[in-house]
């Protein structure tokens, strides 16, 4: 099985190692900030599933996300999704063709549909939008400030999955991190900027814990597609009928209804007015329809890469075992998606650091969240009826893997506690751990946390990948 990685030379990151200050944000809007993320038009934008921009869940956390009094963080790990992007090339072609079809067949564009008559699909493909770049700058700033007792004196070890938008996200994170450090009078002087230390290939034959792709049975699964089609059929037909009535001359499919809903997010995050103006696509749908759309995205993630798929959590086992190695300063023990060449080399997988940052995609992160058992309290999601966030025990695609999402794993030493404690935050929401005895703040001792990851330590169900 092939393995591949690229060690990035410093000159490739010259733009983020030169000590330049962070460029002024596209906006200084109070609804889009470093601490709270994207709170603009939240009644709609927070219902875009994985196409939602990062928004902080600190106010949704039953446990304060602040570092508890009497404790000091001794280890911090962030796992981040890339920032807001343009549609993928394949989806973009479908969106463009649909809009062209509407324009060619509809005779009258009235009211809220008027914009469609002259709308020109000109979005990019695959890469980060300027807004998405700023999301990661902000993420780097926030990470530095949150863990400043460590970041002032330590250079984080950084890995990225091999997609260009993921690498660019890591670079923008570094930009925010380093510019904040340079302005901190208490930071250790003379330290070099962080860099992306390892890029892991996304080739289909490569072992990659950030973006697994070598479990054949899992890759061939069509479960999520079936669930998606069935749930779409519960809410899209009524929307389709309304659109066809209002846009006389066009015939749509249920899937094309969801494409038009996708355009609400993509058209919004691709503009310079992202903080002041929603795309006109958004107004074509009601609040209840957005609730259904958001739940559809959650179903796709849960049954595609989460516990709803028999091999979903197993895809995250390799990363979970790497996390165990980092927390315990011991070699990686894993025979699933880990890259033995990289993980056995201190240059590409050091065990003596206390600050780590990894960058990846939404699907891989979903599997990792479930491999860590963070949503063991989530019962199988209904495939016919919308369930609210309480019923799903805090799981939704928008709450877990929006653009620029971030998982923080913290280890802390606290007064009157001999053993270090571990806790996890997902987008600033403390997620009480499962599989180990937790305290009132959702934490476990490090050793009990590791013992609780027995699913990962035993390799999950990887043996079934080639069944």
From Swiss-Prot:
Which Cys-Cys disulfides exist here?
Answer: 31-40, 71-414, 215-465, 264-282, 436-444
Binding positions for 1D-myo-inositol hexakisphosphate? 50-51, 81-82, 85, 88, 165, 301, 361-362
Spell out the InterPro entries in the cross-references: Acid_Pase_AS, His_Pase_clade-2, His_PPase_superfam, Histidine_acid_Pase_euk
Extract the GO molecular function terms from the UniProt entry.
3-phytase activity; acid phosphatase activity
Q: Does the keyword Secreted apply?
A: yes
Q: Where is the signal peptide?
A: 1-23
UniProt keywords (A-Z) are: Disulfide bond, Glycoprotein, Hydrolase, Secreted, Signal
- The entry annotates sugar attachment on 27, 59, 105, 120, 207, 230, 339, 352, 376, 388
- Which compartments does it reside in? Secreted
The residues annotated as the active site are: 82
The GO cellular component terms are: extracellular region
Q: How is it used?
A: Phytic acid is the major storage form of phosphorus in plant seeds and, thus, in seed-based animal feed. Phytases are therefore of considerable economic interest.
Q: What is its EC number?
A: 3.1.3.-, 3.1.3.8
Q: Which reaction equation describes what this protein catalyses?
A: 1D-myo-inositol hexakisphosphate + H2O = 1D-myo-inositol 1,2,4,5,6-pentakisphosphate + phosphate; 1D-myo-inositol 1,2,4,5,6-pentakisphosphate + H2O = 1D-myo-inositol 1,2,5,6-tetrakisphosphate + phosphate; 1D-myo-inositol 1,2,5,6-tetrakisphosphate + H2O = 1D-myo-inositol 1,2,6-trisphosphate + phosphate; 1D-myo-inositol 1,2,6-trisphosphate + H2O = 1D-myo-inositol 1,2-bisphosphate + phosphate
Q: Which class of enzymes does this protein belong to?
A: hydrolase
Q: What family, per the record?
A: Belongs to the histidine acid phosphatase family.
Record's function text:
Catalyzes the phosphate monoester hydrolysis of phytic acid (myo-inositol hexakisphosphate), which results in the stepwise formation of myo-inositol pentakis-, tetrakis-, tris-, bis-, and monophosphates, as well as the liberation of inorganic phosphate. Myo-inositol 2-monophosphate is the end product.
Quaternary structure and interacting proteins, as annotated: Monomer.
**What is the name attached to this protein's record?**
Phytase A
State the organism named in the record: Aspergillus awamori
- List the gene name: phyA
